[in-house]
Amino acid sequence: MGKNLTRSTLALAVVGAMSSFAMANDVVETTKEKEATQLQTIVLTAEEQVKQSLGASIITDKDLEKLPVVNDISEYVRRMPGVNLTGNSATGQRGNNRQIDIRGMGPENTLILVDGKPVNSRNSVRYGWRGERDTRGDSNWVPADAIESIEVLRGPAAARYGSGAMGGVVNIKTKKVTNEVHGSVEVFTNQPENSKEGSSHRESFNLSGPIIKEVLSYRLYGNYNKTDADAADINPLTESGSRAAGREGVENKDISGRLAWQINDQQSLTLDTSFGRQGNEYTGDIQNSNADATNPDSSFSNIAYVNGLLGKETNTMYRDSYALTHEGKWAWGDTKLLAQFDKTKNKRIPESLAGGPEGSPNSFDKKTSVLDTTRFNAETNVPLDIFLPQALTLGAEWVEDKFSDATSTVQADASGLVQLPSDRTHMKSRIAFAYIEDNFKVTDATDLVLGVRFDDHSKSGSNWSPSLNITQKLGDYFTLKGGIAR
């Protein structure tokens, strides 16, 4: 009897111990599940929250596949609300070189980014008296096949990017590196029904894969695309005997490479290099009043130049870009450091600088201007829980531009080149700015983003730019968005 009691007690003790172990194990597993759930929490930064605000649009790679770009992504971006092209500007000048214009504030107030990095090659082109440049802009340095998405920000949503983005921002995001070898080749052609309109074709490739799996990866893409110029007589003669020039032809050659090094779980280093060449095919545009380029007996004094230039390449842009980016993911937040250098060589024939002949070609000899831009940027995002859940963003940037231009600082006429009194062939400017943004989770239905940016320019002085964006959910089906910025 005593032995049976002892065995029963021992059995109960074992069962109890097993039950306790099972309960303890359940507690441990439950705790692990909770910890895993907490690790999956996503903190939305002010930048990402603003992209959900009023005035933000996203174009995906699927959208670009459904309606392929013929030559320039501006053809697709113009479909977004508030976006137009400068061919419909008030002056109508340089209408055959159309640039992205957001909210009617002109291309000078539209900032073009590639993977968040500004592109400003168009600044190497002479700025006309009426605020137009003879340029295609900076929206065609990345082939459509290499694009993952395009972000279009308008109004208050673009305030964090400063005065150059008063109209808005177009951020072209390229495809990321992959841990498996992937590649693609794209061939595209567009043949218009009207034989006087220029046809287009594009050939591009994209290749990505690992060098050391999970550690070092690469991406390489290249592109060649060409759109022929319209015929010189595509538009009818006016009563005054002038004729509007057709669409200028364009030829693009681009190649870009990326090396991505995953240093460890917290840090990564990315090296980007790209080289591009853009050239035109002249159609007779002379900015203010186009003569009939098909009439060799025109009374216009410079028509001989125009006739001699038809179908030729009158301007060529070369762009080299190098960027090194370090990203860190730490227990307290995220950091991003960027060093970038861009060089643009703008090779074109001289033009008259003032009066009626402004923008008219006057020589067959091309001149070259050079724009060098050096940029350093630092940004950190820190999640906080002080009174309200929030994500604080702190950033600073320093930019230096050096411009060498012997063409736009001389007066060109039929008799030759006359140097202006002041020497502005070499110019230099510096801008430094800092910004603070905070994304507050006021309630489950209310998000508030406050921001302020301070700019200091070596030529134009200082400026403060505050901004506010708010998103309010109204039930399951409606959301109210608003914003204000200066």
What are these regions (language model features)?
Residues 118-154:
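Short acidic/polar hinge/loop motifs at secondary-structure boundaries
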Residues 185-189, 220-226, 271-277, 337-343, ...:
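Transmembrane beta-barrel strands of outer-membrane/channel proteins
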Residues 181, 214-218, 266-271, 330-336, ...:
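Repeated loop/turn-to-beta-strand initiation elements of outer-membrane beta-barrel proteins
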Residues 73-76, 98-101, 113, 137-140, ...:
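N-terminal periplasmic accessory domains that precede
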Residues 74-121:
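Extracytoplasmic beta-strand/coil segments of soluble accessory domains associated
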Residues 262-264, 274, 389-391, 397, ...:
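Structural signature of Gram-negative outer-membrane beta-barrels, strongest in the C-terminal barrel
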Residues 178-307:
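Periplasmic-side early beta-strands and strand-to-turn transitions of outer-membrane beta-barrels
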Residues 38-70, 99, 124-132:
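N-terminal periplasmic "start-of-domain" segments of outer-membrane beta-barrel proteins
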